[in-house]
Amino acid sequence: VRDRIDEAFMLPNVPASGIQRIRGIEGQSGRLTGEAEWKRTIITDGGLVITPLLAFQADADYFNASSASLQAIDDMAAARGLTADTRSSFARFMATAGLELRWPVLFTGPGSSHIVEPTAQLFVRPNETYVGGLAVPNEDAQSFVFDATTLFERDKFSGYDRIEGGTRANVGLRYSGSYGNGWTTNALFGQSYQVGGVNSFAQPDFVNAGADSGLETARSDNVGLAGFSTPGGFSASLGGRFDEQTLAMRRSEGKAAYSGLPVSVSARYTFIQAQPSYGVPEDLQELSFGRSARLAENWRIFGSGTYDLEKNFFTGDGFGFAYDDECFSYTMTLSQSRNRDTRELTQSIGFNISFRTLGDFGSTTGSFAQ
């Protein structure tokens, strides 16, 4: 059960853009989710790798919001010419039949080997339900990024509150190389197509997840990634999302990291073109960094920070500690973030307990805990 009290429900507009969004509700919402997946890999005599897939997800949701939150939902729906379909409870399901084809081709040379792998996927499923009328209280799928790392995901949403529906094809070309001196290289380039049904990423929800993402049209933006790693623990990569027609840069990201003992550090530069409907009214440039230090065999501390290069201030930072052994892990994090427009400070605490053979529960406040 989630119980969120968020002042954002009183202010559904993003001040800088005028686009209505609802980042949280006052009240209670809960969801019970069950998911199952079956897949099998078949390799033909010609080297073609065929992977059929079947998946099923079922949810039971309830929603009990305050009158002010319900009014904010009605206002957002009216602004988009919709009728709010708010429900106190509902059930939904998504069944998927998928097929993936990969054809890895190996090339070898003096001191190196290279694999080029054309890949195609097709996922057939019904349309997503309860999204056109803002019925789903989207809380755990608000964060959304479409790039090369998510191109071949069956469901590209970041959480369970949204479920990708409709028939979609993903195509791309993978490359990996290894060298005698221990270096490795990798690259990926591809595109996604909505070939049938309703495009989930073009449907409204509380935060407009999917809007201006590069997936809201029938033919997605192009995404690419290239990187390398060294035997000394250093790695770097460059990735980007490019307009499907003009190839103009929509998003880019550069990463560099060093992983060693006892210290690991990383840095990342990100450019995001304005996404007004998603709450980014102007171009965004950020510099993020992270560090981790192992204090003993099972204990480590870590931290991260993000600096806004456009407005010249830290938008977020945090730190934490973790314990890991062969059967149990525990993570505690403390973080704070600042609104880019108002500089309002939000602080949070998160934890996660994981049993290797049983599962995990809790929530961490950021990816720097990884």
Residue spans for each PLM region:
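Outer-membrane beta-barrel proteins and related beta-barrel translocases across Gram-negative bacteria
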Residues: 1-370
